[in-house]
């Protein structure tokens, strides 16, 4: 599935290193610290599930690692790029190599599934031809059990089917890191297994890594590690 250029080199044995990261939001009641001196290492090929109660800081940590949110305190290295300060080039480089899967799929209503996936391939440095993108789209959708929707629009699909399209969109560029925020929340058991199975095959084939934020205990047993955030602090295996 992935191109040879997507394979990780031995130069970066860890996909993610988080050291001493803290994050504080300003609220009406005063500053609220949601991350408190968090350390985390995500190894190449590793699949980690991150769980914890709502407001524990899980999504904040995910968006910091994905260079969506700017770092306040501590250090984060993602795929060899140091995040922090005003180095927007490093942030852009990370975002190009990450596949994001969010609970809110945000599909364009006017685009077919294939158009959505083909549009996503334009975000990388060397986008594939239409023919190559079409073949990859067919393969991903078949593995997710929705190949019949290649030329469908979102209004023609169920919520779970649209979520699986979002998974395909995240994987079509063979990302070196997958970050997911409740990616299986709208899926039944069978669909969840299809999604996690596809992610695991991608990790095995490329050496990529995955960090998935979820309350879905159905997938805990499919992860290499299950970590818990509580009151901004990262605890051991849940």
Predicted regions mapped to residue ranges:
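Conserved ABC transporter NBD signature motif
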Residues: 74-85
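ABC ATPase NBD coupling module
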Residues: 32, 83-99
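Conserved ABC ATPase signature
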Residues: 153-157, 161
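Helix-to-loop junction immediately C-terminal to a conserved catalytic motif
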Residues: 66
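Conserved catalytic motifs of ABC-family nucleotide-binding domains
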Residues: 174
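Catalytic Walker B motif of ABC-type/P-loop ATPase nucleotide-binding domains
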Residues: 178-181
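Short coil-to-helix segment of the ABC ATPase nucleotide-binding domain corresponding to the Q-loop/switch region
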Residues: 111-120
């Amino acid at each position: 599935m992935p191109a040879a250029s997507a394979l990780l080199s031995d130069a970066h044995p860890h996909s993610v290193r988080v050291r001493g990261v803290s994050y504080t939001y300003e609220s009406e009641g005063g500053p609220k610290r949601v991350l408190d001196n968090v350390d985390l290492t995500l190894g190449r090929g590793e699949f980690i599930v991150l769980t914890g109660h709502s407001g524990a800081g899980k999504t904040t940590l995910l968006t910091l690692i994905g260079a969506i949110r700017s770092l306040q305190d501590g250090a984060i290295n993602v795929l060899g790029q140091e995040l922090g300060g005003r180095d927007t080039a490093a942030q852009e480089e990370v975002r190009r190599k990450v596949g994001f899967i969010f609970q809110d799929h945000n599909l364009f209503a006017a685009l077919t599934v294939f158009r959505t996936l083909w549009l996503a391939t334009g975000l990388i440095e060397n986008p594939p031809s239409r023919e190559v993108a079409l073949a990859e789209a067919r393969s991903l959708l078949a593995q997710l059990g929705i190949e019949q929707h290649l030329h469908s629009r979102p209004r023609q699909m169920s919520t779970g089917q649209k979520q699986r399209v979002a998974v395909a969109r995240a994987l079509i560029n063979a990302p070196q890191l997958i970050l997911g925020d409740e990616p299986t929340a709208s899926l039944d058991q069978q669909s969840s297994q299809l999604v996690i199975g596809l992610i695991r095959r991608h990790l095995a084939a490329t050496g990529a890594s995955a960090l998935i934020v979820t309350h879905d205990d159905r997938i805990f047993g499919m992860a290499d590690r299950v970590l818990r955030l509580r009151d901004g602090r990262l605890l051991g295996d849940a």
